[in-house]
């Protein structure tokens, strides 16, 4: 159960980080 939760958290972090990189890239930061 803990490993499954950890997996979902990791996916969420990577997904959020990817979107942040795209947004910052478009803003010229």
From Swiss-Prot:
InterPro entries: Cytochr_b6-f_cplx_su8_sf (IPR036143), Cytochrome_b6-f_cplx_su8 (IPR005497)
GO biological process, one term: cytochrome complex assembly
One cellular-component annotation, GO: plasma membrane-derived thylakoid membrane
Presence of the UniProt keyword Amino-acid biosynthesis in the record: no
GO MF annotation: an example: electron transporter, transferring electrons within cytochrome b6/f complex of photosystem II activity
Subcellular location: Cellular thylakoid membrane
Membrane topology, as annotated: Single-pass membrane protein
Record's function text: Component of the cytochrome b6-f complex, which mediates electron transfer between photosystem II (PSII) and photosystem I (PSI), cyclic electron flow around PSI, and state transitions.
Name under which the protein is recorded: Cytochrome b6-f complex subunit 8
């Amino acid at each position: 159960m803990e490993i499954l939760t950890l997996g979902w958290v990791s996916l969420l972090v990577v997904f959020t980080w990817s979107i942040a990189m795209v947004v910052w890239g478009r803003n010229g930061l």
